Design a protein with these regions (language model features):
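A conserved regulatory-domain signal marking ACT and ACT-like small-molecule sensing domains
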Residues: 48-133
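Rossmann-like dinucleotide-binding domain for NAD(H)/NADP(H)
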Residues: 1-60, 104
């Protein structure tokens, strides 16, 4: 089950999907799995079992990790890498996956990541959300 449309985007309301567990054991297992997947996303940017985004996972190789949700359109990756090149950041590891009209790109970079990088990446026409971990 999915949250009611009128609750999406309401300040202070955090909508989560129905887990569908039918026994105490499965409820616990589903809750633990969901918590682990959410923790992995928050700490590492990895996405597992998302309804809206593709599954994307890569091991951390050090440095900073940049996670970008963007429209799946030509030129999106070159815009991202162009900004990173201009900032003198080296891409150590990168993965990009799309699902229909949305894509998710994770990049592990080395170099001096300054505070303005999030704003620069957010300014890309195709960018939806940018996080630097």
């Amino acid at each position: 089950d999915f949250p009611a449309e009128e609750l999406l985007g309401v300040k202070g309301v955090y909508c989560t999907p129905h887990l569908g567990a039918s026994t105490p054991e499965s409820e616990t297992n589903c809750a633990v799995m969901a918590a682990n997947e959410l923790s992995d996303y928050l700490k590492n940017g990895n996405i597992t079992h998302s309804v809206n985004l593709p599954d994307v996972s890569q091991p951390r190789v050090g440095g900073k990790r940049i996670c970008i949700i963007h429209r799946n359109e030509p030129g999106a990756i070159s815009a991202i890498t162009g900004i990173l090149t201009a900032a003198n950041l080296n891409i150590e590891n990168m993965v990009n996956k799309g699902r229909k009209n949305v894509a998710y790109t994770m990049l592990d970079v080395t170099g001096n990541v300054d505070a303005g990088l999030t704003a620069q990446l957010s300014g890309i026409d195709t960018a939806i959300r940018v996080r630097i971990l």
